[in-house]
């Protein structure tokens, strides 16, 4: 009889621990929603006279498809970087073809 009661006590402790673990996992998922977890990158030649695909568009998005695109254009005079904000997978500013491709890759399309 004591053995059965001990097992029930252990079972109650395990159930309580499992519930605490579920709550902690839920907290972790909530925190993850705002972290960048989707990435798309496209390397390209911005100018025909430049080779090596030194320019790139990089899209970084969170779980809700919010984030940004960095476009880095490499030329013989220097390297220029531009950013565009992404909200719910959309950009208020027109995207170049490489930027749109990077966004599409990040969104899994």
Predicted feature residues:
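Polybasic/polar functional segments that serve as interface/processing modules
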Residues: 1-56, 61-109
């Amino acid at each position: 009889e004591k053995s059965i009661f001990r097992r029930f006590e252990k079972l109650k402790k395990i159930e309580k621990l499992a519930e605490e673990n579920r709550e902690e996992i839920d907290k972790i998922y909530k925190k993850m929603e705002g972290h960048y977890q989707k990435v798309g990158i496209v390397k390209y030649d911005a100018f025909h006279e430049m080779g090596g695909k030194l320019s790139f568009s990089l899209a970084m998005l969170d779980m809700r498809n919010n984030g940004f695109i960095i476009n880095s254009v490499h030329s013989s005079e220097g390297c220029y970087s531009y950013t565009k904000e992404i909200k719910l997978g959309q950009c208020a500013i027109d995207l170049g073809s490489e930027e749109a491709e990077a966004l599409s890759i990040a969104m899994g399309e």
